[in-house]
Amino acid sequence: MKARRSLLASAALLLALASAGAPALADELPTFQLTFKADGTFEPQRLEVPAGRFKIELSNESKEPVEFESIPLRKEKVLGPGVKSFVVITISRPGEYPFFDDFHQDVKGTLVVKPKE
């Protein structure tokens, strides 16, 4: 019983330390901006990024909740009105990847992944 508690405490400490370093690592990534505008559009609608690992900072300027979603990238993030957040994406294959606002499905954009230089 004592060994199990010790193991659980060690696992909890390891998890806490691992998650504490995650925001710092995300801050060091190449960063791009994507804004949900009050008029129901994305800005920009085409976001160009280099292949690899990067961060997209999301900002909701509308008065409604929005959701960044990309099925091929397997990413989604819900933002309330006026909220800012981010997603970290790792993709090595250049190409065009659609994304949309799941709450307003006619609002669409494209992530254009360029080859790494």
Regions found by a protein language model. Give the residues of each.
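Extracellular/periplasmic metallocenter environments
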Residues: 27-33, 63, 79-117
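Bacterial N-terminal signal peptides that target proteins for export
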Residues: 1-11
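Bacterial N-terminal signal peptides
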Residues: 10-19
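Asparagine-centered strand-capping/turn motif at beta-strand->loop junctions
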Residues: 58-60
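Sec/Tat signal peptide C-region and signal peptidase I cleavage site
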Residues: 21-26
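N-terminal edge beta-strand
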Residues: 28-51
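Beta-strand-rich interaction surfaces with strong enrichment in secreted/lumenal proteins
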Residues: 44-45, 74-78, 87-88
